[in-house]
Amino acid sequence: MKRLLLIGIGAGDPGHLTLQGAKAIAAADVFLLVDKGEAKDDLTRLRRDLIAAHGREPYRIVEARDPERDRAAPAYTAAVEDWRSRRAQIYESFIADDLADGQTGALLVWGDPGLYDSTLAALDEIDAEFEYEVVPGISSVSALTARHRVALTRVGRPVHITTGRRLAAEGTTADDVVVMLDAACSFTGAGDDFHIYWGAYLGTPDEILIEGPVTEVAGRIRAARAEARARKGWIMDTYLLRRAPAGDRRGTQNG
């Protein structure tokens, strides 16, 4: 039986790789690296560095080009599903053509495979006989709260994890809202009683951290995001919106 490992590698710092993740890399015979283009070479470079550090020879690396997603399509969900299906075809070809029976393949997944990642959903579309295992990693959310030295949860309060697109459509539906990838800077629509903890390129040398009342730091975040995207050609950011308790606009209490 062919076997596939989905290995969470953390938010960007090589030190985010867990002991379990390092052992999983050492157990793999073949690695699939999905290239997102020249602008994101550093994403591929980190994966290669981790394989070189923890892989056991002889191993092979197979490369494939990530399919383009139509970001201008009016039907957002349909566009994402189409892109995911084409991603699934890449994985299916890798399993069929590059793995021999009894071999173990590996995908090194940014962050944690179980949070805001399409790999598991893509694997569900594959019609092939194989086993797979998920190795958890440090997510961008965990990295964000650690870097800002703030707890994700507060006593007796829910946390809502959403996207920038949904935040713009629905507004803040909880006192604590985590937003993944927000190209439109939808946090500007939060009320003046919200505090924001924002981070981009978490765990990398390019890491940017900004926090403060939304009304005071929104402009700084917009400017930093635009400059970083222009300089690098891409950006991955995450933030926590936290409503301050009555009489406290800092939003930093955890109890």
Question: At which residue positions do the language-model features occur?
Answer:
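Short, well-ordered alpha-helix to beta-strand connector turns
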Residues: 25-29, 130, 174-175, 193
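A polyampholytic, Gly/Pro-enriched intrinsically disordered region
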Residues: 79-90, 151-163, 216-230
